[in-house]
Amino acid sequence: MKKNITKTIIASTVIAAGLLTQTNDAKAFFSYEGKGLEIAKNLADQAKKDDERIDKLMKESDKNQTPYKAETVNDLYLIVKKLSQGDVKKAVVRIKDGGPRDYYTFDLTRPLEENRKNIKVVKNGEIDSIYWD
């Protein structure tokens, strides 16, 4: 009788250890999956905010019949991306009265680099022209 109880206790311990290992692996997997979903949600929220902001800027310019204005390079990039049609890979934006630094070049096949997003646009930020490539 003691042998059966000992075997049962050992078997239960082995099974419990296996279940514990599996649940820890599952917790680790689901925690990474949860973080991935959270990051994706944050990116989607940020894209939605950017889109709403650009829509507001463009509607305001259309209403006042003035050239599009941008405060940062990120705004320029989003305006150009929204105005692009077809298979456009590059765009060069010229700012009105910007002097020697009045051109901004964007690769539309990739997202804008983080270090360029918050750079202020020269002068008042009015777009003079956009060249598509």
UniProtKB/Swiss-Prot annotation:
- List the Gene3D superfamilies hit by this protein, alphabetically: Chemotaxis-inhibiting protein CHIPS
Keywords attached to this Swiss-Prot or TrEMBL record, sorted alphabetically, are: Secreted, Signal, Virulence
- What's in the GO CC field? extracellular region
Q: Name one Pfam family in it.
A: FPRL1_inhibitor
Q: Where is the signal peptide?
A: 1-28
Tell me where it resides: Secreted
- Main localization category: secreted
Query: Its biological function?
Result: May be involved in countering the first line of host defense mechanisms. Impairs the leukocyte response to FPRL1 agonists by binding directly to host FPRL1.
* Name of the molecule in the record: FPRL1 inhibitory protein
